[in-house]
A protein has these predicted regions:
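Thiol/disulfide oxidoreductase modules built on the thioredoxin-like
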Residues: 135-143, 148-197
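N-terminal targeting signals for export/organelle localization
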Residues: 1-67, 198
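Short loop/turn microsegments at loop-to-beta-strand junctions
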Residues: 62, 87, 163-164
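A short beta-strand-turn-helix
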Residues: 65-87, 110-113
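Short active-site neighborhood of thiol/selenol oxidoreductases, capturing the structured segment around
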Residues: 77-100, 121
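Structural microenvironment flanking redox-active thiols in thiol-disulfide oxidoreductases
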Residues: 100-140, 150-157, 190
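Soluble periplasmic/extracytoplasmic beta-strand elements of cell-envelope proteins
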Residues: 87-90, 121-125, 167, 178-179
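Conserved hydrophobic/aromatic "anchor" residues
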Residues: 64, 77, 91-92, 136, ...
């Protein structure tokens, strides 16, 4: 049988398709380099995230005045007027599931420290409507001062990334501790006790 040009072209095409279908293998060195590059990118990404989480974690706490809900006595609370006390500022919202989980713990801590007079627990309602906020306060039997963060002035000053977030302000007016998630009564009480001891 003689070989025609058509048979050669068909064979060449089949060989070319086979060559294209065969996966290319990476050398072990290339794999190691890729792993190192990905690890470095991960570390850099985490550092960027931490750098952008710029909540105050020390130094003077941003001052503010909060209008307290009428259902909790009304009036205002100004941070700078309460120097000499440990102030626990909890940012929350009625639509926040983790906030609902920690609400009983916050009330428990307030009941434990309220009579001392040198500890204040303050709730700052974040991006919420008054009706839902008041229903939340009633549902959890909250008695410590709470008010709406009108125009997100306070949460902006504290660079809130989400809720719940809690700041413990020392007697000197500086941020003593920042808590980036829900908190238990036991953990919060331990932080307050350390702040009181300073």
């Amino acid at each position: 049988m003689t070989n025609t040009g058509t048979d050669v072209e068909a064979g060449d095409r089949q060989g070319a398709e086979t060559a294209q279908a065969a996966p290319r293998r990476l050398s072990p060195l290339a794999i190691v380099i890729m792993v190192i590059v990905l690890a470095l990118l991960g570390v850099l990404g985490l550092q960027l995230i931490e750098a952008n989480r710029s909540q105050p974690t020390g130094g003077p706490a941003p001052d503010f005045t909060l209008q307290i809900f009428d259902a909790l006595g009304g009036g205002t609370f100004t941070l700078s007027e309460n120097r000499g006390k440990v102030i626990v500022i909890n940012f929350w919202a009625s639509w926040c599931a983790p906030c609902r989980d920690e609400a009983p713990a916050l009330q428990q801590v307030w009941e434990a420290y309220r009579a001392r007079g040198d500890v204040v627990l303050l709730g700052v309602d974040y991006v919420d409507n008054t009706q839902d906020a008041l229903a939340y306060i009633a549902e959890f039997g909250i008695t410590y001062p709470n008010g709406p963060d009108l125009g997100t002035r306070i949460s902006d000053a504290y660079h809130i990334q989400g809720v719940p977030e809690t700041f413990v302000i020392g007697k000197d007016g500086n941020v003593f501790q920042f808590i980036y998630a829900g908190v238990t009564a036991r953990d919060l009480a331990a932080i307050i006790d350390r702040a009181l001891a300073q």
